């Protein structure tokens, strides 16, 4: 379990065994069942979650009751409500489990303590955050400028493991199209 977290970190910074144990001491571990909420809109969202096993989605429910999926997170990915996490405010997003899920999570306070104590981890989190901003920009530009088919093709190219693990209704919601439109694309 810890090995996956270490591999994730060491793609960016190298850690000795002692350093990794120190890093790990700032994280906690939790298991969730399928359909269980990790975060609910309106509640505190003090944790950033690293997925060891399972699949989650973050989504927003608008005033009309429509779900808008912002992100999926599977093994070796991170998920949180960034606004609530960094600003220590109530969550705007919901995060729930699409499969039984295992996560390591770190509170914003523990993250700040870790970064203050260890420059390598400050660099790691900076690089992780930058990658998240880049992915968000790519997603926004995709929604603004690509056709439904182009968005679907990009989704399957960027995340080839996800279509087999997700119902088409969730993929359609993520792409900002109806389930019927996704079916008309004649995708498999």
Task: List the predicted regions and their residue ranges.
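Phosphate-/nucleic-acid-contacting segments
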Residues: 146-188
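Localized chelating/binding microdomains
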Residues: 14-15, 30, 48, 102, ...
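Amphipathic, Lys/Arg- and hydrophobic-enriched alpha-helical face
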Residues: 9, 32-39
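Cyclic nucleotide-binding regulatory module and flanking cytosolic helices
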Residues: 1-28
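A small-molecule sensor/coupling module
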Residues: 91, 110-147, 151
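Residues that recognize and position ribonucleotide moieties
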Residues: 30, 49, 71, 96, ...
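Cyclic nucleotide-binding regulatory domains
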Residues: 37-98
């Amino acid at each position: 379990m810890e090995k996956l977290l270490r591999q994730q970190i060491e793609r960016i910074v190298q850690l000795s065994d002692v350093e990794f144990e120190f890093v790990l001491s700032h994280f906690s571990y939790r298991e969730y069942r399928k359909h269980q909420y990790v975060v609910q809109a309106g509640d505190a969202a003090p944790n950033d979650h690293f997925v060891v096993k399972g699949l989650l989605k973050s989504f927003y429910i608008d005033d009309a009751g429509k779900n808008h999926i912002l992100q999926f997170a599977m093994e070796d990915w991170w998920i949180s409500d960034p606004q609530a996490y960094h600003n220590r405010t109530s969550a705007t997003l919901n995060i729930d489990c699409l499969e039984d899920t295992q996560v390591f999570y770190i509170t914003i306070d523990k993250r700040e303590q870790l970064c203050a104590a260890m420059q390598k981890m400050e660099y790691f989190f900076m690089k992780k955050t930058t990658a998240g901003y880049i992915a968000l920009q790519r997603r926004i530009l995709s929604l603004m400028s690509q056709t439904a088919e182009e968005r679907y093709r990009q989704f399957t190219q960027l995340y080839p493991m996800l279509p087999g693990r997700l119902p088409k209704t969730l993929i359609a919601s993520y792409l900002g199209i109806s389930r019927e439109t996704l079916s008309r694309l004649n995708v498999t």
